[in-house]
Amino acid sequence: MLSPKRTRFRKQHRGRMKGISSGGNHICFGKYALQALEPAWITSRQIEAGRRAMTRNARRGGKIWVRIFPDKPVTVRPAETRMGSGKGSPEYWVAVVKPGRILYEMGGVTKKIARRAISIAASKMPIRTQFISSEIEEKSKTTRKES
């Protein structure tokens, strides 16, 4: 499971997930990618489950890049605890994902294999996602420049 080696503070505020992703929304490393369409917290377990599903499905071929990292601690209070007496202890880590963010990238495989592997990883995610390829991204860039 992914988690930071050390953090400045043990606990964090929950924060808000408004707007679209400002960074990490273009394909950088691979040729195919999985893009988030909704805002959500994605746990380190979910990230790992998606990564495993992709590697199993790709079978040696290709390379996978995980583009999100769980850097936010989520605190949970013990069961049957009365109100008050401070905030709970950090239980697990999440990555804050906004719409447009690339979750996984894949390269070195055919489009058919990539689509199948990424769709299996998408089923492990708690949000709606879409499969994108670098060719589609290039086309959208050129159409934006023309207009």
Curated annotation (Swiss-Prot):
UniProt keyword annotations, A-Z: Chloroplast, Plastid, Ribonucleoprotein, Ribosomal protein
Example GO molecular function: rRNA binding
UniProt keyword annotation of DNA repair present: no
Biased composition (Basic residues): 1-17
Main location (coarse class): plastid
Disulphide connectivity of cysteines: none
Biological processes per GO annotation: mitochondrial translation
Record bears the keyword Lipid metabolism: no
A single GO cellular-component term on record: chloroplast
Region of interest (Disordered), ranges: 1-20
Similarity-based family: Belongs to the universal ribosomal protein uL16 family.
PANTHER family: 50S/60S RIBOSOMAL PROTEIN L16, LARGE RIBOSOMAL SUBUNIT PROTEIN UL16M
Full protein name: Large ribosomal subunit protein uL16c
Organism: Ipomoea purpurea (Common morning glory)
Taxonomic lineage from the root: Eukaryota, Viridiplantae, Streptophyta, Embryophyta, Tracheophyta
